[in-house]
Every structure is written in structure tokens, then in C-alpha cells.
Amino acid sequence: MESRCKKGYFRLAVIGLSKAKDCWEKNACAVTFIGDGGTSEGDFHAGLNFAAVMEAPVVFICRNNGWAISTHISEQFRSDGIVVKGQAYGIRSIRVDGNDALAVYSAVCSAREMAVTEQRPVLIEMMIYRVGHHSTSDDSTKYRAADEIQYWKMSRNSVNRFRKSVEDNGWWSEEDESKLRSNARKQLLQAIQAAEKWEKQPLTELFNDVYDVKPKNLEEEELGLKELIEKQPQDYMMLKELIPNWILGIGTLALRYDFQETLFNGWHAIAELQQLKLKIKLNSLLNDQADTESLKAARNSALNVIQAMIIHLVLTLKGRFSLPLTEETVRFNEPIQLNQNMVKDGGYTAELFPIRKEEQGEVRR
């Protein structure tokens, strides 16, 4: 409902919706929104006339900020705003200060009551000021003064006006404000943490649940996207790295010393893991579940080799043992515990749980 032509179209659709609700719910009405630029579309006028004739319980809310993107209202129409257009079609019309939250609330409540009790349409024209740009591609300072924008942003700020009103009436206080901000921040952080745990949907989901039977042009677009991802995978990597930086750091450290061949095998496993990680990401994006499972198995195998390398590296650096690195060695060693609070030179300090005496002897034999 953002484009103007779609806004005009929905003027008609919402009228049908409002009449349909009469069949099963009497205490209800439909509400639709439009900007001052959208009122220049033909469907807006057809919608007003249709609603008036059908006596549809619908509330039309027009946000008149004086600009249709960069076109001023003086270049759109010569009438006294939008409210007179509703009157011309026999519709009760209200003009209200759209920057006053309490005034808007009062006007909408009155309009809804009229629409429901009298079964008739109502038009509300909210006179507002658009502080921001129309869109990210718009620079409103090219067609209006920056000082004007700053004045409305600071001196006529609608949020500040609302807060002053509720504080003057004793409905709000600085303590309430502090509690609200604290609770809102806490809830926001919790929501972000929960959202980060959700697994991202594959890009192929963009093409599902749009049509009952996927049309040919959509299939071609989906195929084109898959080909593009395979050619330029680096541009579509949206998941976190599967390999933490500390693994790469330890692998680099291993190359500085003359360690056994297993350490170099571990380094090669890191490189292999990088490739597997990339393939798993691509399969996740392309929703290729079968191949992903086999890749994950290969990834786990590479991780085992890397874990063995880390254990051997830590033991050697600490001078505790000089053992051949085998599956038994890895199996008898307890898992490495990474203490992320011990950060040095951008890397992590690896701490190793003690190995039990009897297990040490069995390994040595």
C-alpha cells in the first residue's frame, strides 16, 4: 500500500470489505489510509463516490503533508485541501492537526462512532509535516529549506508535544519515562538475541507461497538467482562464520614451530573446513538438504582433526608431553575449554582440563 496507484486501488477494495462485514459483525468498520498525492488518482474519487452511494461504514484517513514526493499541493489541486473533496461526494469530513496525537485520537474515535452507528463513510484529513525524506532516494532539502525542516523537528516536534500534554495532565512523569525506556531496551535486546538464534530461511523461499502454481517467469527468476549465487557466493553469505577466528590463529601459530606432521594435517583440515563451510552455506541458501547432510559429516570429521591439532599444540607448548597424536589420544583427552575472558593479541587463551593418570599411562603404552 505504499505506491500511490495501489493506494487508490485499495480505496475500492476496502469499501467491499466494509460492506461484507455488515453480514456478520455490526459493530465494526473498515479503515484505509492515503496521502495527499494519492488523492490525485482517479480511484480515490471513485472510492469516495462508491462509499457514499453504498453507505459503506469506512473511515478514509488522508495524511496531508503538502508534498507528493517532491510535488507541492499547489501543483496538485486548487481546492482547500482534501476535506472539501469528501464534502463534494456527500461524505462527512473532518480536518485535524495531525501532529497532535490527542487530537488525532479524538477525531478517529468520533469518525469511527459515526461510521458504525450511522453506517456511512467518513473522511479525515490530517494536516501533518513530513520531517524526513519521502524515501532513501529522496533529498527533500532540494525542494524545501533545511531551516524549515529543523524548526518542525525541534520546535514543533509531535512527540514532545504529546509528552508535554500527558505530563501536564498528570498522566506521565520522568520516572515513568525512565522505567519505560529501561524495559523497552531490555525487551529489545532479548528479542534481538532470540532472533539471532533463528535459522535463516533459504533464498528459494522468496519464490514460494506467492502463487498456487509457480508461473514460468518465476521459475526462470529462481533459476537465475541460483546460478548467480553459484557464480558469486561471496555476495550472498549471510550466515556467521562456522570457523571461529581463534582456530585460524592457532593454525597460524602451529606453522611457526617445527611440530609433527599431524599439525600440518590439522592446518590442511582448516583449509578444507573453509571450503566445506562455503558449500554448506550455498546449499543452505539453495535449500539442498541432501547434499548439506553429507557436507556436515565431512565438516565434523575436519573439526575432529583440528581439535586434535589444538590439543597437541597446547600440550607441546606447555611442555607436558610429547605424544604421537592418535585417535586414542584425542579420545582420552577431555574437551578443550576456551576462556573467552582471557583475550590476548586478539586471540583466545586455550585451557586444557587435566588428563587422568591412568589414561596417561594407557596412551603411552
Swiss-Prot record:
One of this protein's GO BP terms? Answer: pantothenate biosynthetic process
The UniProt entry, under InterPro entries, shows:
Alpha-ketoacid_DH_E1_comp, DH_E1, THDP-binding
Please list the GO terms describing molecular function. Answer: 2-dehydropantoate 2-reductase activity; oxidoreductase activity, acting on the aldehyde or oxo group of donors, disulfide as acceptor
Pathway this chain belongs to: Cofactor biosynthesis; (R)-pantothenate biosynthesis; (R)-pantoate from 3-methyl-2-oxobutanoate: step 2/2
Q: What EC number is given for this enzyme?
A: 1.1.1.169
Q: What Gene3D superfamilies does this protein's entry cite?
A: 3.40.50.970
- Its domain of life reads Eukaryota
Task: Supply the SUPFAM superfamilies for this chain.
Answer: Thiamin diphosphate-binding fold (THDP-binding) (SSF52518)
Membership in a protein family: Belongs to the ketopantoate reductase family.
**Task performed by this protein:** Catalyzes the NADPH-dependent reduction of ketopantoate into pantoic acid.
Q: What protein does this entry describe?
A: Putative 2-dehydropantoate 2-reductase
The protein's organism comes out as Arabidopsis thaliana (Mouse-ear cress)
